[in-house]
Structure formats: structure tokens, C-alpha cells
Amino acid sequence: MGQKIHPHGLRLGITSDWKSHWYADQSYADYVAEDIKIRDFLSKGLDRAGIADVVIERTRDRVRVDIHTARPGIVIGRRGAEADRIRRELEKLTGKQVALNILEVKNIDANAQLVAQSIAEQLSNRVAFRRAMRKAIQSAMRQPQVKGIKVVCSGRLGGAEMSRTERYHEGRVPLHTLRAEIDYGTYEAHTTFGRIGVKVWIYKGDVVGGRRESEINAPAERRGRGDRNARPRRGGQRRQRAEQKQEG
């Protein structure tokens, strides 16, 4: 079940939070449809801005839209012209006053949606799919909070006659563990051979007692190769034994 279901929906209220914050009785269906229109408008109109997430919060006469983006300069525009245009379009769509918040995503390689979008853009530019997938995995695993990643590409890979699915993963991605913080993102690459779907799962540790392991481990240095001078060199033990024999 954990392999099939959306990781965010499975963990709502446990490790993940809702992306729409509002309450409605009779207008529930209208608000849901409006949220979908807002997200579609932002994803299609700002496809080059690297939109990672859109959080919508509603009050009686106001709508607040938080846009998490990798390139805030594109969303803001010159002297805020693009942000004003987006605000006007959203006010026209919702019929209410819109407060627009643009938030920058600091760590691009640890965000599943941005990783999926990056792979899809490379596939659209005719980069080999294996190269794009492996490069994304290597970049993600260098981040201190990332403990595992899985990438799936499906479609006419490499222009093949028959579509197929390719999977690559590194580290742990426990999809059945509810306390696990799993980031999930999807994107479509439009190529001359057709569409190629990209899915990315990123495991960032567990959430224990309301504290995220990724936030605790973020400042610490990742366990890597370390300092070359701090490691024992090859033949170091043999040299020590030889010196001890000479002294003896």
C-alpha cells in the first residue's frame, strides 16, 4: 500500500501538513475547485520559476497564497511587476483580496519536486535519461538531511518504440513507515517522442515527538570521505610495526 499511495496523503496529520488551510460548509466544492485553478495557473504560468510548493490559506474575505520557489526573482519580476500581475490575476480568479508571499527554497537538491522538474527539463533538452537520473541522485545524497532517494522515469525513454519504466535508488526510502519524512514530487517531460513521467521520493529521516530529524541533522556535516590528513594512510600499520622491531 505504501508503494502505491501518495506519501503526502498517507502521512497527513502525522508527519506532513495540509497544503490548503480553510474551513467551509456549503462552499467546500467551490473552494476545492478554486484551489486547483490557482495551482494550475501558477504551475503553467511560472514553469521556469521552479515552483516547489503552493500553500493556500483562506479567511472570510481574504486569500493568502504562499509560493515556495527556487527562483524568486522570476516570480517577483522587475520592481515587483510580475508579482503584481500574478496578484491581479488571482484576485480576478477568486473574487477576493489576495495576499501573495514569495518564499525562497534554499536547498534545491533536497526538494523532491524541484529534483523531478530538473530531471524532466534535462530530458526535454535531450540529455540521456540515465545520466540525468544518476546526476540528480548524486547531488541529493550529498545533502546532510537526505538519507535516501528513489527516482522513476516512465515513457519512451531514449526514443524507444516501446515505453518502459526505469528505476534508480540509493540509501533507504521506507514508504511503509508512517513516522518517516518522505518528500515526493512529480513532473512531466515533453519530448518529440511523447511525454515522459518523472517521480522522485526523498527520505529525510524520522519525525519523533514532533521534531524532524532533517532539521536536527541539517547544520551538522554529512558523513563523507572526511579530511585526507585525518585518515590513516595505506601501509601505516606496517610502518609502525617495522619501527617497533627496530627499537626492540
Curated annotation (Swiss-Prot):
Which domain of life does this protein belong to? Bacteria
Record Pfam families: KH_2, Ribosomal_S3_C
Gene3D superfamilies cross-referenced by the UniProt entry = 3.30.300.20, Ribosomal protein S3, C-terminal domain
SUPFAM superfamilies, alphabetized: Prokaryotic type KH domain (KH-domain type II), Ribosomal protein S3 C-terminal domain
* KH type-2 domain: residues covered: 38-106
**Region annotation Disordered: where it falls in the sequence:** 213-248
Task: Cite the CDD domains for this sequence.
Answer: KH-II_30S_S3
Annotated keywords: Ribonucleoprotein, Ribosomal protein, RNA-binding, rRNA-binding
UniProt key word Cytoplasm: no
Report the record's Gene Ontology biological process terms: translation
Q: Which PANTHER family match?
A: 30S/40S RIBOSOMAL PROTEIN S3 (PTHR11760), SMALL RIBOSOMAL SUBUNIT PROTEIN US3C (PTHR11760:SF19)
User: What the protein does?
Assistant: Binds the lower part of the 30S subunit head. Binds mRNA in the 70S ribosome, positioning it for translation.
Q: Which family does it belong to?
A: Belongs to the universal ribosomal protein uS3 family.
Q: What is this protein called?
A: Small ribosomal subunit protein uS3
Q: Name the source organism.
A: Corynebacterium efficiens (strain DSM 44549 / YS-314 / AJ 12310 / JCM 11189 / NBRC 100395)
Q: What is the lineage of its organism?
A: Bacteria, Bacillati, Actinomycetota, Actinomycetes, Mycobacteriales
Q: What gene does the UniProt entry assign to this protein?
A: rpsC
